[in-house]
Amino acid sequence: KVRSPGGEEIPVISSRLEQEVEYSFVYGRSRIRIDYRLNDLATGSEVAVVRLEEPAAGVWTFQLVQESAGYGAFHMWLPIRQFVDGSVEFLRPNPDSTLTAPAYAEDVLGVSAYNSRNNSFYVNSGRGFALDGRIKPELAAPGVDLSVASGMLRGSTVVASASGTSLAAAVMSGACAQFLQWCVQDGNYPDINGTSLINFFVRGAARDASQSYPNRTFGFGKLDVAGVFDWIAGIVRG
């Protein structure tokens, strides 16, 4: 059930197959829409998507009731920051298992972001692991204060500094493209596939002796293209 900041409550709503319910609160203009998916196509899990329209300011309370006997667990996420006001947050948030799609997909190389200048984890990056226990992200790539083209001015490219996991994904994509060129176009390993590509980068990843791997932030380690070739060449780093 749901309780508004003013104390108004919506009773327990039982889940139904592909059911969508909508309520309007008496006090104020707040409306809530709950979309139930008993068998999510992507995960197979039971999912409830909750949308609040014109929500009243204050603390909203959501209470989940277990309808059947046995073990039960649930997880809740807010949309990414670009989709909600900065003041919307959980009272007691947990930063783990906060990667966004498609990083959780199987046979996909998921990356988090870190600061390559001081090797610190980027605070706004999502973290693993996947809810089914799979190691996600696989790697961390540079994603803080990177130089990017932000436009054109009088025929010249304007360069700016930016941070984010989308930049880390771009850096990782570039590394994969160059490695695939070496494997396929240059004829060094023409039979490479997606799984083996991921394994090459995992085995060549840079790892800090002070951390244990795999972990929720850096996965199996940091992107290290030179480390991949060292591993191929049989060079053991100290």
Task: Put a short name on every predicted segment.
Residues S210-G238:
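C-terminal domain-closing interface element
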